[in-house]
Regions:
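A short beta-strand-loop-beta hairpin characteristic of the jelly-roll/cupin
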Residues: 46-73
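Histidine-centered metal-chelating micro-motifs
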Residues: 40-42, 61, 77, 81-87
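A generic "binding-loop/recognition-motif" signal
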Residues: 28, 48, 67, 83, ...
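Conserved hydrophobic/aromatic positions in well-ordered beta-strands
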Residues: 31-33, 53
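A short, N-terminal "cap"/entry segment at the start of jelly-roll beta-barrel domains
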Residues: 1-31, 42, 73, 77-78
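Ligand-binding loop in jelly-roll beta-barrel domains
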Residues: 81-106
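Short, charged/polar surface micro-motifs in flexible loops or helix N-caps
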Residues: 26-28, 36-40, 59, 103-107
Length: 107
């Protein structure tokens, strides 16, 4: 599968983070998270799954464990299995993040 212009697939919603599935495989999930200004994905953890956030557009306040930082387009953060993480759009513009989970979520 080849997907070009991934960010163009983002789906924004006014009430909460938008989610779009890009690919689901036996060992990997790839999705887009779309955030309007101020929207967030609250602190949570994934047992048995590692997660990578790659900022495609905008800027992101990210917390992984005890570490907090602001990421820009092209920056990434990794949350290992069981580590609490959160992400928020602090900026005035929309934010799009590629989210990769391995292994994928169970249906």
């Amino acid at each position: 599968m080849i997907v070009r212009q991934v960010a163009s697939l983002a789906e924004f919603t006014p009430d909460k983070m938008g989610k779009t599935t890009i690919a689901m495989a036996e060992s990997l999930f790839v999705g887009l998270n779309a955030f309007e200004p101020g929207q967030e994905h609250v602190a949570h953890a994934h047992a048995g799954q590692d997660k990578l956030y790659l900022v495609l557009e905008g800027s992101a306040e990210v917390r992984v464990g005890e570490e907090e930082t602001v990421l820009s387009a092209g920056d990434a953060a990794v949350a290992r299995s069981g580590v609490v993480h959160a992400i928020r759009n602090p900026g005035p513009n929309r934010m799009i993040v590629l989210a990769v989970l391995a292994p994928p979520p169970k249906k």
